[in-house]
Amino acid sequence: YKRQIHQRIKKLDESGVILGSRLVVDPKMLGFDVCAYIGIRLQDVSILMQTVDRLKQIPEIVECHFITGTYNLFVKLYCVDNEHLMTTLCDRILAIPGISTTQTYISLNEAFQRQIYVDCLHD
């Protein structure tokens, strides 16, 4: 049984389905008590990649997604507290040229998290 699982994982790895492995840390254990999501609208989509490059330089931002709808980008970030969030938003994110509006959503609690389901027992 273990051999079958090992072979399946190896096949998934070789085919590029598995992108790697990593340690997952709990941000709260490191003192980051606020998880927030920010929708970002740009004045002009021609600066999209420049904006992404600037956002990459903000270590509190852990994810950035291109999205459809009202906003162009959606970022996830972790901050120590609400004051840290406000400073990050006002002094760093809104300081990026070309950002016209943002909307911030604070996560009250994570209900669950998971990776996409892969059936390791069947091909």
Annotated model-derived regions:
Residues 2-123:
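A compositional/biophysical signature of low hydrophobicity enriched in polar/charged and small residues
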